[in-house]
Amino acid sequence: MIKLKIKYGNSQTDIRFPCTEKEMNAALERIHAEDVTPLELYVSEVIFPEELGCLQDRFVNLDEVNFLGKRMDSFFGDEEYQFYEAMKLEGFDTLPDLINLSFNLNRYPLIQDIGDMGKIGREYLLTVNGCIPAHDEDDPKYAQLGRELIQSGNGIFTEHGM
């Protein structure tokens, strides 16, 4: 969920995304912006999540924010952390970039438990390929891949993992 304080003229209101068209229209009516086209309004504050602070103090397209909110609501497991870490890594700060990133999280594996080399290899392949065979979970090739990934130096340690 995304919650922003939007401003139009001297009026402000909070709006949560994703939202229905009815909820969007009600919020726009509260600030007398129902006739604004294109639907770009000023964000005076990003209430939640703080990681989207890049949207604050700028004009944004509310339809794009709503679409991003829908994408973020569909995140599963650690995908939200993946999204925030990839966003920071790449320096993405525009809505089109953030929406695009939400469709490409498989390019940014996030491994939270780096104590087990086999688990690192399995999680990496699962993120990048989308699946791994269930019958060879204990195969040493995953531990070897995990060691190679750690030794490559390409991994970046973050507050949510590597």
Question: Across the structure, where does each feature detected by a protein language model lie?
Answer:
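Generic alpha-helix signal with a bias toward terminal, lower-confidence helices
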Residues: R16, A26-E29, L55, D136-E137, ...
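Alpha-helix initiation and N-capping motif
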Residues: E21-M24, G118, Y142-A143
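Mixed-charge (acidic/basic) macromolecular-recognition segments
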Residues: L28-C131, D138
